Amino acid sequence: MFAGALLLAAGLSSLGFAQKPGLKFNPDKKFKIVQFTDLHVKWQDPRSDIAFERMNQVLDDEKPDLVIFTGDIIYSKPALENMRNVLKTVSDRKIPFSIVFGNHDNEQGATKEELLKVAESLPYSLTADEVPEISGVGNYALTVRSSDGKKDACVLYCIDSNTYSTIKGVKGYDYIKRDQIDWYCKKSAEFTRNNGGEPVPSLAFFHIALPEFNQAASDENAQLYGIRREKACAPALNSGLFTAIKENGDVMGVFVGHDHDDDYAVCWYDVLLAYGRFTGGPTEYIHIPNGARVIELNEGARTFKTWIRTKAGVEQLLPIRIHS
């Protein structure tokens, strides 16, 4: 049986299917994630050199267990080659990675479905389309096993925040749809049930901020850490994901991109709402040094640390404790 499993894995690899690495807390009960966002890479454009430089520097400095790209990865044709080239920066280092889409990725001559296949095909990719029948492309949940490998110790929800509003009379960006929220709630309930009725500590990653980011940032009682140079370009309509998060009691933090001049984090009803740091170069607007957000999870606790890593070093080190 074991030999057969090895042959099957080898056969799949030879057909071009990437093996899916497992995620697990380290023996020190830590697990580190690097979030790259808004690379806006233009094919063979020198202005994107600094994006690759920063990714490599952050990976050298942080040595993460997982990298998550939160959208707007590519910004020119040829789309498939461009996407593959960006993701190989991580894949070639044998670091597990996953992606969610931004509102610009499918504007470069390829569909999200085509781009997803590129991401899925690379070694060390955990990118998936777990539920193709619901809205968006690339909604999936990643599990991080406990250091002893006996249970799911953390869940990472990767969600497509879609692109632009399709409702007549409603301008601006789209929202996470009801069927996507229903999927998250179903998965959350399943993980909670399998964990003896206790919600599994979780994080959520997508591109476009929730409306609650603006609410939290403008609340005089909320402590905001980091840079806020622009209002969150959130959907005009609130579809209720944050309410579902509070009802389920599992997600400790929501991590987004999209707004290049923001990298702040603010706790809102005991959920950290946080931007990544813009990782790209001057192919798009940017008024702060590029970098990345880092998240370090603690096994068996609703606590984590997060900080920004730039060329200059570490900024905004925040120890976060979420009250159940």
Task: Please report, for each region that a protein language model flagged, where it lies by residue.
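Bacterial N-terminal signal peptides
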Residues: 3-13
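N-terminal active-site segment of His-dependent metallophosphoesterases
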Residues: 17-89
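Binuclear metal-dependent phosphoesterase catalytic core
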Residues: 22, 27, 36, 141-146, ...
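Active-site-proximal beta-strand elements of phosphoester/diester hydrolases
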Residues: 30-43, 153-163, 205, 272-278
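Acidic/histidine-rich helix-loop elements
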Residues: 34-52, 73-81, 107, 113, ...
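Active-site environment of divalent metal-dependent phosphoester hydrolases
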Residues: 42-44, 75-80, 99-110, 164-167, ...
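His/acidic metal-ligating clusters that form di-metal
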Residues: 63-65, 155-157, 170-263
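Extended active-site neighborhood of metal-dependent phosphoesterases/phosphodiesterases
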Residues: 84-197, 293-298
